[in-house]
Curated annotation (Swiss-Prot):
<keyword id="KW-0227">DNA damage</keyword>
<dbReference type="InterPro" id="IPR007696">
    <property type="entry name" value="DNA_mismatch_repair_MutS_core"/>
</dbReference>
<dbReference type="GO" id="GO:0140664">
    <property type="term" value="F:ATP-dependent DNA damage sensor activity"/>
</dbReference>
<dbReference type="InterPro" id="IPR036678">
    <property type="entry name" value="MutS_con_dom_sf"/>
</dbReference>
<comment type="similarity">
    <text>Belongs to the DNA mismatch repair MutS family.</text>
</comment>
<dbReference type="InterPro" id="IPR036187">
    <property type="entry name" value="DNA_mismatch_repair_MutS_sf"/>
</dbReference>
<keyword id="KW-0547">Nucleotide-binding</keyword>
<comment type="function">
    <text>This protein is involved in the repair of mismatches in DNA. It is possible that it carries out the mismatch recognition step. This protein has a weak ATPase activity.</text>
</comment>
<dbReference type="InterPro" id="IPR007861">
    <property type="entry name" value="DNA_mismatch_repair_MutS_clamp"/>
</dbReference>
<dbReference type="GO" id="GO:0006298">
    <property type="term" value="P:mismatch repair"/>
</dbReference>
<dbReference type="GO" id="GO:0030983">
    <property type="term" value="F:mismatched DNA binding"/>
</dbReference>
<dbReference type="InterPro" id="IPR007860">
    <property type="entry name" value="DNA_mmatch_repair_MutS_con_dom"/>
</dbReference>
<feature type="binding site">
    <location>
        <begin position="621"/>
        <end position="628"/>
    </location>
    <ligand>
        <name>ATP</name>
    </ligand>
</feature>
<dbReference type="InterPro" id="IPR045076">
    <property type="entry name" value="MutS"/>
</dbReference>
<dbReference type="InterPro" id="IPR005748">
    <property type="entry name" value="DNA_mismatch_repair_MutS"/>
</dbReference>
<keyword id="KW-0067">ATP-binding</keyword>
<dbReference type="Pfam" id="PF00488">
    <property type="entry name" value="MutS_V"/>
</dbReference>
Amino acid sequence: MNQEVKQSEVNLEQHTPMMQQYLRIKAQHPNELVFYRMGDFYELFYEDARKAAKLLDVTLTARGKSNGEPIPMAGVPYHAAENYLAKLVKLGVSVAICEQIGDPATTKGPVERKVMRVVTPGTVSDEALLDEHRDNWLVAISAHESQFGIACLDMGSGRFSVFEIEGEDALISEIERLRPAEILAPDLLTLPPGVRNKAGYRGRPEWEFDIESGLRSLCAHFATKDLDGFGCRGLTVALGAAGCLYAYAKETQRTELSHIASLVVENPDNTVSLDAATRRNLELDINLNGSEENTLFSVLNTTATAMGGRLLRRWINTPLRDLHTLHSRQSAIAALLENYRFEQVQQELKHIGDLERILGRIALRSARPRDLTRLLNSLAIYPQLQPLLKSAECETLATLASEINEFPGLVQELDKALVENPPVVIREGGVIAEGYDEELDELRGISTNAGEFLVKLETQERERTGLNTLKVGYNRVHGYFIEISKSQAEKAPAEYIRRQTLKNAERFITPELKTFEDKALSAKSRALSREKALYEQLIEKLNEHLRELQISAVAVAELDVLNTFAERAHALKLVKPEFRGEAGIEIEKGRHPVVEQVLTDPFIPNDLTLNAQQRMLIITGPNMGGKSTYMRQTALIVLLAQVGSYVPAEACRLGLVDRIFTRIGSSDDLAGGRSTFMVEMTETANILNNATSDSLVLMDEIGRGTSTYDGLSLAWACVEHLAEKLKSFTLFATHYFEITALPAQLPTVKNVHLDATEYQDNIVFLHNIQAGPASKSYGLQVAKLAGIPGAVLRQAKDVLHKLETGKPESPAPVASRSSKPSMQADMFAEPQPSKVEKRLATVIPDDLSPRQALELVYELKKLI
């Protein structure tokens, strides 16, 4: 807590009762901004006010004094609070929402207030605060030595999972995969900067990660003796992380977490490992600029539902090594392609809302009326999906059909209970339909019939009193009244009681009108209370079916993704990959799924073969010739196959890979103090230390960040290690043409190159993969395309000619440049004999006399 509040707490009597109440509440929430409800505003005080004014761009004012100094204050209107909360959550700031729970009209002193919820980046469930296209992960991390336990919770859907991994590299990879909104970790745990510096990082006390405490709290939640039924036997640190995460979730939500119905234990051995560099380089769902444009996800995502889009993103980031699941997904895609069934399914899915998050809000008792309307409309679609799935004669789709259960009772109940277009919130009523509840209809009838009563009373009183200016009215301040003009006011009957004097009229009340007023106003209040009670009963009734509804929502999301795969297979001309028992990758006319969609010209497809006899391809060719595209398309085709999708090729046969590694592109890490070359070597080290014979490795331009000798030596050694020791399936792109000599020594290494041709001093890229090494790099032609000045190109051409003809003496200097370019010998070029060597080659030592030998020494000395 800030120092000001701490000082103030010592002398609470110096403050007003209201501020004393605030300070006590703030003391319980030192790490959150406290939104303190005062009438129509949420107010913030002291350092909270200063911080909010800066982050939210609201006015910083003052209220009263503390120790003689004005108390800083800022506020936001309660009706617009969601917008401000959304901004704070995106900035990684947590907020405690303190509401008035007492009645100001009947309370002496400060109105009773209580923190009703704590909004944190990882625990939000409100629709306005969430990105519908992304999971919102709350992650807890615990550790013992080099082992990390990770627990993940998506509060919106109730998805809860745990797993254990080894080493910091694996931890960074998982954080990159999950991209959590909030991270909980022990205060004293040392974590990599890439984890600890994330927005939303929260240090927590060590005791919150106690394994035994975590186990007890989770068993209590799931009402089980142990967690073996969830597959948790053998887990240790992950249970400590899960216990902390669960306690934190309960603390922030202030209600039961009934939508957390299961705990999933993820097994890293069942998935393809993708490190952080690979996810970045392959641009799976975020491109190198940080947006979704031109990513694999953007090309594949034609899902009809928000929850389907989120599941697609998870699948893309978690390719599988489970053949049963992959074959199951493939069979569903094939069935949905039959007779264009996917088109009919997609039309129905478009009417289904974000059920996962709607059900999460229902469980947390924070669902709004329109959530229930969307649920009703979604459940009404289920019967239309059933025949489409059951007629497919596909086991996978039949299973989904059984899980997408029909809920006729709930549909009928919701349809009867809700008006067609309910208001956003229940606060003002108007949500429950007429005819649903007799008591509510009666109370509403009193208010509705008030107009008729007033007209009737006005007519009656005019006739009885003979006062033609008499009229009956109502306003919120004074309630119901009888108004008579000044000129006739003195003739008012004795039973008329004066209520208000106006400039031109007097207003009265009568015992009869007062009785009606009490009844009408009471009826309105009672009707609103009754409506809120009925709404809460609806929520409870839905919670009774929560688990079945959640299962159906998960099945709908899976159907949506499989249907999207079918639609994409049809639209993009994708084919079903064939999985084989033996290791290897064979692709016929493969295409890059993203680049193909961006190009205006036809994409040039290429073949690829990697097997036991050919485990590595050394790829040479000009820059812009397509080396990186060819490498990335191979990785994306393999990844798509192991997601269960069809792939962009004419045919694809492969064995399962366990990991995909990429070392492509150049970037530094200035924040971490690492140069471009250091980043390159760190990524290379990760590959060499972790790749296996079942891994796919892409390495591009290893060694270019240092001198020619160092770089070439490193590249050479990497090729040998990958080919001879690791035996990984490798695509190795390089500009070191000396590397192309290695296939002569390493039988499983082959040369290929990207074809190009030269026409009138210009380069034409053919983008075709050909056997053998490239004949030249076309570097000067690419430089010309890039706009390098002509004078520089002419000088470079002169230098190149002298180097290629074996005359590395300095070329004539350019007028504007007096320094001579330094030349570096080709490490593996055939050495040219010197004059001394040539002279010695003609000498027969045994034929020389001592004098001739001495003369030869003098002769050779002159040649040096």
